[in-house]
UniProtKB/Swiss-Prot annotation:
Disulfide links within the chain: C355-C586
Polar residues: bias regions: 143-159
Lineage: Eukaryota, Metazoa, Chordata, Craniata, Vertebrata
Organism the protein comes from: Danio rerio
UniProt repeat feature Hemopexin, residue ranges: 356-415, 417-473, 474-522, 529-585
Gene: mmp21
Protein's name in the database: Matrix metallopeptidase-21
Propiece residue ranges: 21-170
Glycan attachment points: N398
Length: 599
């Protein structure tokens, strides 16, 4: 009998020991079979649940709007969706409500509006999408009401002729909504719009208990840094990863989870549909059942694109039903080079304002390039510099290059890391020389090899004193530019202008002169007078711009003066704001300067 018992024990022990599951693949591909799959939308019942979940069907007597605006002590991070009980008015009313909601969904999804649950509608509902409820205002818009969305849809998506309008800052601080400071966040699934952070530097953290099981921690953090940087490049917001402050002091917390996760009131539904959701002014959660991938991966869901979308929600943006918008609710596969488009930029700037700031130097860099066919062409690009950073401005697109700013020492080899005071390109039939000025010194730049010259033609080393080679001029300068029309360099210092004749290598006989004399104001009293930040001859506009602070003055062109001969030579037109002419030249936090998109 004892022997039999021992045999049974051995068999049971063997069964227990061999029940351990073995994983063989380093890429965890053998785990995918255990991932929970989201419920498919297959019939009118599942379609009705979908429409209810995302706000197309409202529960009878629902008190959602009152809850979302409450100033009481409800803990929104822990509460369930609460609805006041009510009575139904019968199946016919329910059917009509379903058809109406279905038609709304079809309109917003650019489907034929039939009110019928057809295959196209089914496919649209089964697409991966954000878990944030669709904005009430968006749903009202489909019935024809006047709103912001109508403005967005009718506005042109080309950027060339846009004049920036003053931002409408409709802000309400959450301290007025929630008494408990640790609960100062809102669920964007009940987004009501026109609310924003009241500060411009925001802290974020990928929480330790919320790492993804599919990507390395380094990959996750790189993607989130890049996603935050993309919003920073188009708004006055700056983001910094904070690993040390108490968690309640972190503005935006990110994490991955499945099903019931991270103490959240919402459940994830598994792979295949809802990939993430966000809480206004607070948290972003990603469904770790989804197959998230790094940029430049052909399959799966781009974590970068999803992160940019969800950060948009946290910052205050609702879903936007417009082709090209990063805020569309459904995931649309895009190429690896997707960016935040013009209208999404304007949407975030309506909440936070536009980027402003003074520049130390602005110039067009001209150089010769050889085409693949062996032809030599002359090209130029516009650059803005300040505080040791530079932006390349794409005039044809009216925006900065994606991924800017960049540190000066990275892109302009050999220049002072803090930037420069002035740029001059002497370009005529006999001379093609680029100079940068800083303090009392100047450097000559080799545009062909993209670095400063180490030696002058006479063998002396660069940098050299400005006064040595530009007699009558000494640093530090405010700014300078070369005017091809009269072959003079215009040096600006205080209220004076020094005109330097490059052919004769000396100052013009009338120099120095007062800036108000050389560049008279067309509108009386409208003049920078002294201490310019930058003077810049633009080959795009074929004229000179003078910049000071947040303002600029355009110098009357020769063509304009020929049409209106009564106007003074070099007259300054009425000032305008820099951000009205050159859009989205925005700073990023110093910690994200090296975060660039990998190719």
């Amino acid at each position: 009998m004892l022997t039999v018992i021992r045999r049974i024990f051995i068999i049971q022990t063997f069964i227990f020991i061999t029940a351990e599951k073995i994983f063989h693949s380093r890429d965890h591909s053998d785990v995918l079979n255990n991932i929970h799959q989201a419920e498919l939308i297959t019939d009118t019942d599942t379609a009705q649940r979908f429409l209810s979940k995302y706000g197309f069907i409202k529960a009878a007597g629902s008190e959602e709007s009152q809850l979302s605006e409450s100033s009481g002590d409800l803990d929104f991070s822990l509460s369930l969706d609460l609805h006041e009980g009510g009575t139904t008015s019968g199946s016919s009313s329910s059917d009509l409500q379903f058809v109406s909601a279905l038609r709304d969904f079809q309109r917003l999804s650019d489907l034929p509006v039939t009110g019928v649950f057809d295959d196209a509608t089914k496919a649209a509902m089964n697409k991966p999408r954000c878990g944030v409820m669709d904005d009430d205002q968006e749903l009202k818009d489909v019935t024809g009401s006047n709103s912001t969305r109508n403005h967005i849809r009718t506005s042109t998506n080309t950027s060339h002729n846009h004049e920036h309008q003053a931002p409408v800052r409709k802000k309400r601080h959450l301290s007025a909504l929630l008494k408990n400071t640790s609960l100062q966040k809102r669920d964007v699934s009940k987004w009501t719009g026109h609310m924003a952070f009241s500060k411009s530097v925001l802290k974020w953290r990928l929480i330790g208990e919320g790492y993804s099981s599919q990507l390395s921690i380094q990959e996750q953090k790189y993607i989130f840094r890049l996603a935050f940087r993309m919003w920073s490049e188009i708004s006055p917001l700056q983001f910094i990863e904070d690993l040390h402050s108490p968690l309640e002091n972190i503005d935006i917390r990110l994490g991955f989870g499945t099903g019931r996760h991270l103490g959240c009131s919402q459940r994830f539904d598994g792979a295949g549909r809802e990939f993430a959701h966000a809480w206004f002014l607070g948290d972003i959660h990603f469904d770790d059942d989804e197959h998230f991938t790094v940029p430049n991966t052909g399959s799966g869901i781009s974590l970068l694109k999803v992160a940019v979308h969800e950060i948009g929600h946290v910052l205050g943006l609702p879903h936007i039903y417009r082709p090209g918008s990063i805020m569309q609710p459904s995931y649309l596969p895009q190429d690896a080079g997707f960016e935040i488009d013009w209208m999404d930029r304007k949407s975030i700037q309506r909440l936070y304002g536009v980027c402003t700031g003074r520049f130390s130097t602005v110039f067009d860099w001209i150089r010769k390039e050889q085409t693949p066919y062996g032809e030599v062409v002359v090209r130029f690009n516009t650059y803005f510099m300040r505080d040791g950073l530079y932006w390349l401005y794409e005039n044809r697109n009216n925006r900065t290059r994606y991924g800017d700013p960049v540190a000066v020492q990275v892109g302009w080899h050999g220049l002072p890391s803090g930037g420069v005071d002035a740029y001059v390109h002497v370009w005529n039939r006999k001379t093609d020389a680029v100079y940068f000025f800083k303090g009392m010194q100047y450097w000559r730049y080799d545009s062909e090899n993209d670095h400063v010259f180490s030696h002058a033609p006479d063998g002396r080393l660069y940098p050299r004193l400005i006064s040595e080679d530009f007699p009558g001029v000494s640093g530090p300068l405010d700014t300078a530019y070369y005017d091809r029309r009269d072959a003079h360099i215009y040096f600006f210092k205080g209220s004076q202008v020094f005109r330097f004749d490059v052919r004769m290598r000396r100052l013009a006989s009338s120099s120095p002169q007062e800036m108000t004399e050389v560049f008279p104001a067309i509108v009386s009293g409208d003049h920078p007078v002294r201490s310019l930040d930058a003077a810049y001859f633009s080959y795009t506009h074929n004229t000179v711009f003078l910049l000071k602070g947040s303002l600029f003055w355009r110098v009357l062109s020769g063509k304009e003066r020929r049409r209106r001969a009564f106007l003074p030579m070099n007259g300054l037109l009425a000032h305008r704001r820099v951000h009205e002419q050159w859009f989205d030249i925005c700073d990023v936090h110093s910690s994200s300067l090296r975060t660039t998109r990998r190719r």
